[in-house]
Amino acid sequence: MTETTILHRPPTRLSRVDEGAVCRLLQDVVGACFAVPPEQMRAGSRGRAPAAFARQVAMYLTHVVFGLNYSAAGRMFRRDRTTVAHACRVVEDRRDNPRTDALLQALEDVLGAFTRTQVRR
């Protein structure tokens, strides 16, 4: 198998047991990148713009990197599937900014590598 094949392998579906761990991991990693405490990302309300965008990024990564559908991602973050769909659109629109795109690509690469190492175990 070539390196290209490995990098473009479709995401593996997580078991229900893993979803809670993934949610905490994403909140910690994304929260650190955006200087937002994980508690703010877990809040029931939208919160301030930085916390809301960090939560949107975490939901986007849940869908893109870990392959969860909108409903499953919504359950992880205690949000509706339409909220996750909106988050994905917002994040995709923000990728027009080169700095945001580079940060998101780095997060996707790191979390994708983590996923591949966990799947092999």
Regions found by a protein language model. Name each.
Residues 63, 87-88, 95:
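DNA major-groove recognition helix of helix-turn-helix
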Residues 83-85:
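Helix-turn-helix DNA-binding helix
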Residues 27, 69-70:
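Helix-turn-helix DNA-binding elements, focusing on the entry/boundary residues of the two helices
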Residues 71-77:
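Short alpha-helical "recognition helix" segments of helix-turn-helix
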Residues 95-113:
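Short Lys/Arg-enriched helix C-cap and helix-to-coil transition segments
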Residues 1-28, 121:
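General nucleic-acid-binding
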Residues 32-55:
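Short, Lys/Arg-enriched anionic-surface-contact patches
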Residues 52-67:
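Short, amphipathic alpha-helical "recognition" segments used to contact nucleic acids or chromatin
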